[in-house]
Amino acid sequence: MAKKTKRRGIFLSPAIAAVLAVALIGVSFGAGWFFGVRSTQFHGDILLVNESHRLSAEYVPDDLVNLYTQRHSFRMASSEIYLTRQTYEAMEKMFHAAEEADMNGYIVTSGYRSYQRQQEVYAESEPGKAQQPGASEHQTGMAFDVTVETNEGFESTPQYGWLMTHAHEYGFIQRYPANKADVTGISYEPWHYRYVGVDAATRMHRTGQTLEEFLGQ
């Protein structure tokens, strides 16, 4: 009688199996999704998004509101601009205060942008002019771009000066300040503001830190 040979299988622990699964997914979508790129993380209640902390293609905030349908103390470049409700409410308070201080004319030009829309923006932009899909803060619904009607740069206007002095009081930071591109990976954008909450924004305003520096990233 022939001797039966025992077959030995390879058993992996659930943790190792999960790591291998992520690695295979990363390879199938491109090495950048696994090697050298960390997943986006919450630091407390602050969401960090940049080239090293990306959002998935499926990520969509669950509380987006259309600014056009809400009470607003600002103008809009489009009737299809969305932000999370918390971000909108803080922004409305901020621009209402600006209006009471005779700082008028703010125009919100951009808010939430889906992963798929960011793919289009990235493909249509010159190299270095737009973030890669998943690396844009606009996908969080907590960032917006703003300007005013001017023949000068926004950073030369009184409205910009008011924001630089008061934005933190409403939970906003200028996300990509001048002379910090080596930290943020993004050149100066005086028009781009991000909601992080009053406490964090105030602390960053006092120290001059970027979000990466504040979070130790």
Model feature map: region roles:
Residues 2-111, 115-217:
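Extracytoplasmic cell-surface/polysaccharide-interacting catalytic and binding patches
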